[in-house]
Curated annotation (Swiss-Prot):
InterPro entries, alphabetized: Amidase, Amidase_CS, Amidase_dom, AS_sf, GatA
Record key words, sorted: ATP-binding, Ligase, Nucleotide-binding, Protein biosynthesis
Family matches, as Gene3D superfamilies: Amidase signature (AS) domain (3.90.1300.10)
GO annotations of cellular component type: glutamyl-tRNA(Gln) amidotransferase complex
EC number of this enzyme: 6.3.5.7
Organism classification: Bacteria, Pseudomonadati, Pseudomonadota, Betaproteobacteria, Burkholderiales
Keyword ATP-binding attributed: yes
Organism: Bordetella pertussis (strain Tohama I / ATCC BAA-589 / NCTC 13251)
Protein name in UniProt: Glutamyl-tRNA(Gln) amidotransferase subunit A
Subunit structure, as described in the record: Heterotrimer of A, B and C subunits.
PROSITE patterns listed in its UniProt record: AMIDASES (PS00571)
């Protein structure tokens, strides 16, 4: 049995900020409590790197800023970062032996912005190797265990982030979502998580997997907490070539333009102040087919019924290419991974084999030793579909299909519905090792999240119940919006969380 961290006694981020301002608790006390809780819950394997000296130094700086009246909006809030974000002073491995011992000389933009806001990092969180996986079993440093049932996976690839939030070791965590890697672990661990519109949160300093798909997003117990984080994380970044410049707001001294308050916050305020009467919730028939487990279907149906009680209207919509998102994604994402991971050759950086003959053997052995099986599998797929003889037949066809998938969503939003809702995952969390002999089974777990990623839309996961044989494995509701509609999604989630308590429930024990 492990103790919860001290921050849980004060509620969400807003309440915690108020407690810090009133000196009811100090940032150092919160940080030390979080470190103690993380150590006690080490059996979850959620954390990869912890440095108490760095954490407590940040906490002391937050306390000083609070005392001086110069504190940022997240001053003293204990968080942690997925190990896919580079961090100055902390090791960054992306869950891979290839980057064992790597220390970045700079911070990712997301890390930098959260630090500027005063957040205190407790460490780096476990993840699937190079963010490739749906169960956090592909980490070179061992699987993460789900706090609700330690025999179960937490989801992936941001499994360490979801597990740490679910176990209440931190108030919030960062994650990345390429094909569902924030939403899926959030659902399986019973926490809230959001993937923003592609390009609204900087990718600078995220170790790349699929550059046209990767997007950073936060995980936290509630949608209100997510808004607090997204308000800081969102904004144009000239260091990221994919960062969107269509932002409102004033440039700060570093030249960056923040759009969080003017966009996500404004959308949240506008949607939150309006009654739900007449809100059209699109329910895709393709999300409720034979592959959806009955316990997941029941929990999602109950959530939809709750929204109807709040005044929303349920309307059927069709996303006919839902299942085709799987082959499209597993052509495009591996192709981009093959290109992005080509740099890890042991020459300039990355693991280098101890024994080799010529240069070619050194590169071959270094990559064979440094990469895990799933990463190798995707590199091979990507290299194949980008080869001269198959580029048109596979890669270009997948890109055409990607456009058609995006058009399906736009047809739904154009005149049929305001938001789309459905399950995040077709099942509750599987047991660790269940899919070891069939790695493609994990690919199918993302059938409801991949289309959103290919289209670049915002979507989030909200806890909506439990399933499984023992009834203690969480289920998540997916809420999908049109481009830049994060504020509305968060407001709708908040309305739901005002009348339900799924997001307030935490696992009693994190014994492994």
């Amino acid at each position: 049995m492990t103790q919860s961290a001290l921050h849980t006694e004060f509620g969400g981020i807003a309440a915690l900020r108020d407690a810090l301002a009133r000196r009811q608790v100090s940032a150092v006390e919160l940080a030390q409590s979080g470190l103690d809780a993380a150590q006690a819950a080490s059996g979850l394997n959620a954390f990869l790197h912890i440095d108490p000296d760095l954490t407590l130094a940040q906490a002391r700086a937050a306390d000083a800023a609070l005392a001086a009246g110069t504190a940022g909006p997240l001053a003293g809030i204990p968080i942690a970062h997925k190990d896919a974000f580079v961090t100055r002073g902390w090791r960054t491995t992306a869950g891979s032996k290839m980057l064992a011992g790597y220390a970045s000389p700079f911070d990712a933009t997301v890390v930098e912005r959260l630090a500027e806001a005063g957040a205190v990092s407790l460490g780096k969180l476990n993840c699937d190797e190079f963010a490739m996986g749906s169960g956090n079993e592909n980490s070179a440093y061992g699987p993460v265990r789900n706090p609700w049932d330690t025999q179960a996976v937490p989801g992936g690839s941001s499994g360490g982030s979801a597990a740490a939030v679910a176990a209440r070791l931190v108030a919030a965590a960062t994650g990345t979502d390429t094909g569902g890697s924030v939403r899926q672990p959030a659902a399986l661990c019973g926490v809230s998580g959001i993937k923003p519109t592609y390009g609204t949160v900087s990718r600078y300093g995220i170790i790349a997997f699929g550059s046209s798909l990767d997007q950073a997003g936060p995980l936290a117990p509630s949608s209100r907490d997510l808004l607090e984080l997204l308000d800081v994380m969102t904004g144009f970044d000239p260091r990221d070539a994919t960062s969107l410049q269509a932002c409102d707001g004033q440039a700060n001294e570093s030249g960056r333009v923040r759009r969080g308050h003017d966009a996500a916050q404004a959308g949240y305020d506008a949607a939150g102040s309006q009654p739900l009467k007449g809100l059209r919730i699109g329910v895709p028939q393709e999300y409720f087919g034979a592959g959806l487990a009955p316990d997941v279907a029941a929990a999602v149906e109950a959530a939809l019924a709750q929204f109807e009680q709040l005044g929303a209207v349920r309307v059927p919509v069709s996303l006919p290419r839902t299942e085709l998102a799987i082959p499209a994604y597993y052509v495009i994402a591996p192709a981009e991974a093959s290109s992005n991971l080509a740099r890890y050759d042991g020459v300039r950086y990355g693991h280098r084999a101890a024994q080799y003959g010529d240069l070619n053997e050194m590169i071959s052995r270094s990559r064979a030793e440094g990469f895990g099986d799933e990463v190798k599998r995707r590199i091979l797929i990507g290299t194949y579909v980008l080869s001269h003889g198959y580029y048109d037949a596979y890669y270009l066809q997948a890109q055409r299909l990607r456009r058609l998938i995006a058009q399906d969503f736009q047809r739904a939003f154009a005149g049929q519905c305001d938001v789309i809702m459905g399950p995040v995952s077709p099942t509750v969390a599987k047991n660790i090792g269940d899919n070891r002999d069939d790695p493609t089974a994990d690919w199918l777990a993302d059938v409801y999240t991949l289309g959103v990623s290919l289209a670049g839309l915002p979507a989030m996961s909200v806890p909506c119940g439990f399933g499984g044989q023992d009834g203690r494995r969480p289920v998540g509701l997916q809420i999908i919006g049109n481009y830049f509609d994060e504020g509305r999604l968060l407001a709708l989630a908040d309305r739901y969380q005002q009348v339900t308590d799924w997001h307030q429930r935490a696992p009693v024990s994190q014994d492994a």
